[in-house]
Amino acid sequence: LTAATDVTGFGFLGHLSEMLNDKISFEIYAGNVPVIAAAREFADMGIIPEGSYKNRDFASKFVSGEADILLYDAQTSGGLLLAVPQSEANSALSRLKDAGYENSAVVGVATAKTEFGINLI
């Protein structure tokens, strides 16, 4: 484990932006980020917390392209975002799933610094 943050009030992309530094960026597989089905249903109805819009206003400067609003969703008890060496990712994912965290997923990779800190794929 090289870094970790809880995904709470600043949403996934807000907290990911806290992990940026002057040497790395992230490629994020947006479709791999676990989303609670009911959150998707509410977002599709336009029911989105005000904090999510504020998070987008802040963090979008770090993000290439248009991100799903749920990636900015303000959480009160979100998941954990963990960074592990790429060579250990599959093993870490297996251990998390074996421990009962079945929604765990590899959601991206760290890369050399690019124009945007967070590049959505």
Sequence positions of predicted segments:
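Glycine-/charge-enriched secondary-structure boundary and capping motifs
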Residues: 1-121
